[in-house]
Amino acid sequence: MLEAPSFDKMLGMFYYATDTCPSGGVIKRSPEDFVVEEVLLDGTVIATSGVELRPRVGNWTWIHVVKRNVDTIKLVLRLARALGLSHRDVSVGGLKDTKAVTSQIISVRGPVANLPQLPGVQFLGMWSMDKPITPSQIYGNRFTIILRDVERISCAEGALEALKKTAAPNYYGYQRFGTIRPVTHLLGKALLKKDPHLFFEVMFCKIFSRESEVAKRAREAACKGDYAKALELFPKKFVEERVFLKRLAGGYDMWNAIMAIPPQILRVYIEAAQSYIFNRFLSIRMEIGPIDRPVEGDLVEINRQIAYYAEGLGGEVVLPVVGAGVRMPRGKVGEALLRVLREEGLDPSAFLKMPRGLRVYGTYRRVRLEPAGFEYKIMGNDVFMQFTLPRGSYATVLLREVVKPAEPHKHGF
C-alpha cells in the first residue's frame, strides 16, 4: 500500500488503493468543472437542465434548485428566512459541494407562492408532495468533472485504469474537514467532550497560513478577547464565527454562546468527528488485510443486514460510523478500533449525550468505493470524468487517488 502525505493522515486517510505516480492537476478551476446532480432512489437524475416529477397531494413543496458556489446549509437558512419559515421546515436529501454547480431537491413545508431571488441560485421547478425530501429517498449523485492542467497524463491514465479494477477506500473526503482550515472534526471533538474552551481555541486561536489576511486578523482579535474588533473584521459569510462572537460580546457564557450557532452547522462539526474516526478505522483495517475480503471479526452487510463474518458467509465488509447503537467488530479488528477511540478520548455514548437536535446515532459504512458508469476521456492536458456514487460517498476520494496531492488546496480540493 502506498502511504499518504501528512495532510491526509491528519484527516485519518493513511493510504491509497493505487500505487501510481501523482498526476497533479487542478479540480474546480471553475464551478462548471465540478457538476453534481442528485439521483433519486428510482434512478431519476435531478439534472441541471431540468427534470419532471409527478406531484402528489400533500403539505410539502419540492423545489428543484441549481446552485453555483453556494453552501447547502447556508442556502437552507436563507431560503427559510426568505419564506418566513423555521429552518426545521426546510429539508434536503444531502449536502452538496459548495465550489461546484449542483442540482438537487429542497423541500419546504406548505405551499409556496413566490420564490426569492438568491445570488448563485436558480429554481427550476416546484411540485406539491406528500412528504419532505430526506436522505433515505436519495440513491446518490452523478458527477461530471474536469481535472485541468494535469502535469503527468500517463500517471492520471494509470490511476484511472487501476480504479476500473480496484475499489478505492471509502474514506470521507477532504471537504468534510476543510482544506484551508482543516478543523471541522476538531470542533466536533470539542463539542463531544463538552469542552467550550477547546472549541473557542480551535475556532479562533488555530490560524492557518492559507487563510485570507482579513480572516487571520479577525481570528487573532477574537483569540485575544477583543470580540468587538473581531466582529468588525469578520465578513458576513463567516456565519458561525459571528454568531458565537455576538453572544460572547453580549455576556453569554461560552457554552451557551456556542449553542447559539445554527444547529445544522454544529451537527456538521459532530458528523465530521464521526467521519475522522471512521477514516482512522478504515486505515487500520487496510493494515490488517485487503478490504475486499472479510477477515475474522469483521462486520459484513448481507441483504441490508449487518452480521459478524463467518466462513462461507460472504458479504460486503463494513465498519461502524461510531455513535450510539452500533456494534463493534471483534477480534484484532475490534481491538484496533477500540484503541483508536481511547487515543481520541471519545466514547460512543458521547454522541447521544449531546443536546437535543445534536444527538448523532451510529451507523455502518462500506469500506470499498466503486463508482457506477465510470468513464473518462483525455483532452490534451485535461481529463474529463463522469460517474455515479452512492449517497455519502465522495468524488474527491477517487480524484485523490489520481492527483495524490501533498497540499490539497493547491489542487482545488
Swiss-Prot record:
Keyword Isomerase among UniProt keywords: yes
UniProt EC number: 5.4.99.27
Recorded superkingdom: Archaea
GO MF annotation, one: RNA binding
UniProt keyword annotation of Isomerase present: yes
Any Pfam family the entry gives: TruD
InterPro entries found in the cross-reference section: PsdUridine_synth_cat_dom_sf, PsdUridine_synth_TruD, PsdUridine_synth_TruD_CS, PsdUridine_synth_TruD_insert, TruD_catalytic
Residues in TRUD domain copies: 167-370
Top enzyme category: isomerase
UniProt catalytic activity: uridine(13) in tRNA = pseudouridine(13) in tRNA
Gene3D superfamilies in alphabetical order: 1.10.1510.30, 3.30.70.3160, TruD, catalytic domain
Residue positions of the active site: 97
Segments traversing the membrane: none
Alphabetical GO biological process terms: pseudouridine synthesis; tRNA pseudouridine synthesis
Keywords annotated in UniProt: Isomerase, tRNA processing
Family per similarity comment: Belongs to the pseudouridine synthase TruD family.
Role: Could be responsible for synthesis of pseudouridine from uracil-13 in transfer RNAs.
Designated name of the protein: Probable tRNA pseudouridine synthase D
Native source organism of the sequence: Pyrobaculum aerophilum (strain ATCC 51768 / DSM 7523 / JCM 9630 / CIP 104966 / NBRC 100827 / IM2)
